[in-house]
Amino acid sequence: GICRDTTVESMVIVFADIPELTCVWRAFPRPCIAPYLPWYVGIAKLPKGYENFGAKTALASHFAVDPTEFRYDSSRAYWAFHMLENIMEFDYQFCEEKVHGDIEKMEAAMTAAKPLIDEAYRKLAETSPEYARQLLTDYTAAQAQKAWEWAEQTALELVDMKNAANMDFWRSKL
């Protein structure tokens, strides 16, 4: 399956006639834990918190990772998804309904918005290619930020829900 403990990332690429509108629908770390987010090929830069290093530094340190990279850092999106992933793996069945319901809603909204963003890009590109590219950059960043905030909030909610369920269980034994 596409959602196993060995899955690091999943993506679906939707090619477009206009290369900048080619969209990589990316689920990190796994599609059962995170929504597929639209990452347009035409973006000018990666969303804040999603790039740890520049390309040269990343290549140089790929097989010799600095130990500080393994410490939690709230300024990096990776850690929000990693925290959610760990909570989900601890009790997948307990978390599944909430997480999958949220993912379905987010993906439906992004899927519905895509044709509108594409059309806005096309119209804007006729008069200002730079602004059109910025539109894609801003939209991609906004969706990435929403998902990051959702992952953080959902991880906390799941912990609270699990604690409440445990307390209810033990109270029922009194």
Specify the residue positions occupied by each region the protein language model found.
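C-terminus-biased signal that marks the final domain/tail of proteins
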Residues: 1-174
